[in-house]
Amino acid sequence: MDSVSGYAAGAGQPRVGGKIVRPRRTAVVRTPCERPVQRSRDPPQQNPSWISRLVYKPASVIASGAGKFISSVVFSDSSSSSEEDEDSSSDIDGDEDVEKNNPDFTEEDLLSAQQPSIQRLSSKRVIEQLLLQETFAREEGDRLIDIIKARVVDHPSVPSAIETSHDDYGLTSDVNVGEMSNTAVMEARKWLEEKKSGSSSKYKATEDGAGSPVDVAKSYMRARLPWGSPAANNLDFRSPSSARVQGTPLPYSAGNFSSSKLKRKSGSNQSWNIQDEIRKVRAKATEEMLKSPSSVASLEPKYSPYVLATDMLKGNASSLNADGAVRNEQSRALPNSAIPTSEHNQTTEANQAVKETGVLHTRSRGVGLEETFISTQGVKPSEDTNTAPQSGTAVDDFNDQDGDFIQPTSTIGNTTNAVLALGATLDPTGNSCIPKDVFETSKEADEIGASRHTSNGFPSSSPSGYGRSTKTHTTRRNQGFSAYS
């Protein structure tokens, strides 16, 4: 009883009495959320595992799909293109079905299953189709790329990059190259050797402070590649001409050359000694400027072919040659500030004599031409020029007074000079002569003008007097002649 009661107490809750009670089996209460259990017609397999699910079922599916794929590829030559498209589409659909049914299936399993039958086909095409059907992560893509690169083989005539031996400079020794490439290789090797041997010592000297900037530039240019500056090998320095430096045919002064312009125009391929070249260019430019006739002509003053009486009276001695051209004897005279005191005094006396004895009349006509004539009031022509006064001005006649021409002269001190007046021409002997009627008309004009003198010795500025003198006593024989005052 005790055992029975103990059993009952141990099996269930403690009860009173010795009756044995068995536990009842209660059915599991099903809820609407639970799906009904599908019963398969196949007999249940014992001990199912993930290997059977990953290998057996996909293998059967792959076998059926591979049979279709092989048949489509083998008989594609005899079939039309439309049939081939249908077969390929069916194969792709079959492969997609396989991937949907078995998402854990890998590419290696597919290749291992199809390996016996795919050996006769183009494996590259199969691989391409398989790759197009999949999407890869970045790591998987990098791994596939590495595998493909490892399997790359060069053209049969050229050895692969893995089998060829490389030297220290990264150049292959088994590949045959042309003469030009061999020359470039030799130059590169030579340049590297020179750079390794000589560049260290040169740069050490510059770092210590012993080298100048010019030495640094020279070492830098020497260390450059020989093919970096092709013009440096066959460079023949030539001194830049004035036309290239300044852009003009001839420089006007040697000071126009500056070091900055020379450096800018000459370029980087010129000589290193710039200062010597600047000196040479300046000396050459000065030489050319002195030798050039245009520069010499520009230094000499240009004189008018007509000499005025006022210039002659101031002391500028001028004379006429046989051709009628004026030769100035004081072209290289000192400036006005350097004239001696005695010469200045003589010039003052001559100007005073002009005020007393002669008047220079200048009139302008409506057409823009000027007429100049010399007043000779109070002065009579003499037959001998040696009897002329020392401080006066006289107009003499060397020729016959009864002739058609007269030759006027101007006497200043002991010097007698010819005067070129309006209407003057050359006589048969080559001297300057004035027609007699022109000279007489000038004398009459002087007499009328002298009667209208003012207190300061100059003619009156009334327009009526000038107009009457011009109308009455001015000759218009030479309409094209112009005299400059």
UniProtKB/Swiss-Prot annotation:
Biased composition regions of type Polar residues, renumbered to the chain: 373-393, 452-469
Broad class of where this protein is predominantly found: nucleus
Subcellular location: Nucleus inner membrane
Bias (Acidic residues) ranges: 82-98
Disrupted gene: phenotype observed: Aberrant nuclear morphology.
Chain positions of motif Nuclear localization signal: 22-25
GO biological-process terms attached to the record: nuclear membrane organization
Comp. bias intervals (Basic and acidic residues): 32-42
Region of interest called Disordered, as start-end residue ranges on this chain: 1-50, 74-116, 249-270, 364-404, 444-485
Chain positions with N-acetylmethionine modification: 1
Source species, domain of life: Eukaryota
Keywords: Acetylation, Membrane, Nucleus
GO cellular component annotations of the record: endosome; Golgi apparatus; nuclear envelope; nuclear inner membrane; plasma membrane; trans-Golgi network
Function: Required for nucleus structure organization (e.g. size and shape).
PANTHER family noted in UniProt: NUCLEAR PORE COMPLEX PROTEIN NUP1, PROTEIN KAKU4
Subunit-level organization: Core component of the LINC complex which is composed of inner nuclear membrane SUN domain-containing proteins coupled to outer nuclear membrane WIP proteins, the nucleoskeletal CRWN/LINC proteins, and, possibly, KAKU4. Interacts with CRWN1 and CRWN4.
Name by which UniProt lists this protein: Protein KAKU4
